[in-house]
């Protein structure tokens, strides 16, 4: 087994993909938590810096210099969270992918449990997405209310049976993700896209923590406006997707 202090020489079981933009104060603490959560698991950590203008690149370089199993990818200019996730998953070497936000609000300690559930479901032969569900959210009242409204409206439109599609903590196979359509803001619709592809979505309760360092790079109204437009597009995709049942060759 590879050392926890270096990238594994063989393909890791899981790649933890973390998209970040201007999260310098959260880099070192979150990487330490990811490493602690995955002790004994062959893993890599893939950070995608989405055009940060603060000290995020320097903090990432410092973390790698002290031995973190870390890969660093960088967008020259900000392209958005979904683009960063896509970049990270494409570069990842693990069979399984865990995504989480870079602000420290998702708890890496939940990753092993979600991974175990994904592996247990995978033996059934159907692609699976394990989606985190932030049961006790530690956000402002405005953010909680807007998220609740958006989740209910999305569930009504897409029938994705997911109470918290916006949770950044998810576990899925790399193969599943690469088979999905890729577009801006797709990370918000992974459950619906997985169902459209014939997969299964399972929501698991996860810990959620208040942001203690830095500030959000996205405004609530901006998220709502963008999500509504994308929602229409995903609904369009759903209604035009067909999965034929192919009979055995004669």
Regions found by a protein language model. Name each.
Residues 23-37:
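Short, well-formed alpha-helical segments that are part of the catalytic scaffolds
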Residues 23-26, 52, 81, 107:
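Donor nucleotide-sugar binding loop of glycosyltransferases
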């Amino acid at each position: 087994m590879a050392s926890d202090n270096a990238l594994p020489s063989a393909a890791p079981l899981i790649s933890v993909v973390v998209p970040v933009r201007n999260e310098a104060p959260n880099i070192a603490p979150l990487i330490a938590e990811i490493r602690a959560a995955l002790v004994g698991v062959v893993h890599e950590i893939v950070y995608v810096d989405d055009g940060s203008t603060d000290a995020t690149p320097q903090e990432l370089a410092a973390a790698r210099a002290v031995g973190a199993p870390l890969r660093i990818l960088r967008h020259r200019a900000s392209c958005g969270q979904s683009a960063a996730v896509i970049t990270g998953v494409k570069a990842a070497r693990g069979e399984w992918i865990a995504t989480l936000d870079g602000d420290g609000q998702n708890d890496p300690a939940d990753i092993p449990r979600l991974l175990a559930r994904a592996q247990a479901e995978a033996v059934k032969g159907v692609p699976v997405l394990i989606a985190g569900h932030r049961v006790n959210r530690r956000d402002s009242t405005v953010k909680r209310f807007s998220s609740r409204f958006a989740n209910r409206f999305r569930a009504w439109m897409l029938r994705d049976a997911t109470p918290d599609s916006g949770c950044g903590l998810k576990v899925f196979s790399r193969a599943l993700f690469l088979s999905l359509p890729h577009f801006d803001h797709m990370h918000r619709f992974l459950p619906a896209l997985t169902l459209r592809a014939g997969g299964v979505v399972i929501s698991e309760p996860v810990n959620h923590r208040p942001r203690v360092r830095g500030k959000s790079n996205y405004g609530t109204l901006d998220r709502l406006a963008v999500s509504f437009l994308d929602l229409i597009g995903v609904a369009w995709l759903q209604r035009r997707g067909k999965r034929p049942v192919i009979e055995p060759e004669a």
